[in-house]
Curated annotation (Swiss-Prot):
Keywords: ATP-binding, DNA-binding, Metal-binding, Nucleotide-binding, Repressor, Transcription, Transcription regulation, Zinc, Zinc-finger. The keyword Ribosomal protein does not apply. The gene is nrdR. GO terms for biological process: negative regulation of DNA-templated transcription. One of its GO terms (molecular function) is ATP binding. Binds 1 zinc ion. Residues 49-139 form the ATP-cone domain. Its cofactor is Zn(2+). It comes from Acetivibrio thermocellus (strain ATCC 27405 / DSM 1237 / JCM 9322 / NBRC 103400 / NCIMB 10682 / NRRL B-4536 / VPI 7372) (Clostridium thermocellum). This is Transcriptional repressor NrdR.
Amino acid sequence: MKCPYCGYIEDRVIDSRPTDEGSAIRRRRECSKCLKRFTTYEKVESLPIMVIKKDKSRQAFDREKLLNGILRACEKRPVSIEQLEKLVDDIESQIHNSLQREVTSKDIGEMVMAKLKNLDEVAYVRFASVYRQFKDINTFMDELRKLLNEK
């Protein structure tokens, strides 16, 4: 590792420990020339997940965009930000665990709806109305009937 102070290439690792719940390693190093210490982080490089949109264009998966869409559906509902963060974590893990590098926006929407249905039914209906693009009151009522019949 190149010393950030003098540029010398050789150093020694003084301390090494896991961070971020084991997803990275923090290493404390000492330069062999100037003896100054510095910290480096080692993390597994992951390939970005690409989302295939309805128009077939591709866009990098954006966790914040997903969270914001779910937040809108949960406005003025008794759902904590921690619950929403966990919901997004679960969806992100599900996508990564599928080992696919591409996922459709339709698949993501279905994952969100499945999780929201268990978390808050009003938020589920709000999200479904945007995601499924309800054209009129009848399609909205059909979704509500499905939800009631499942109970």
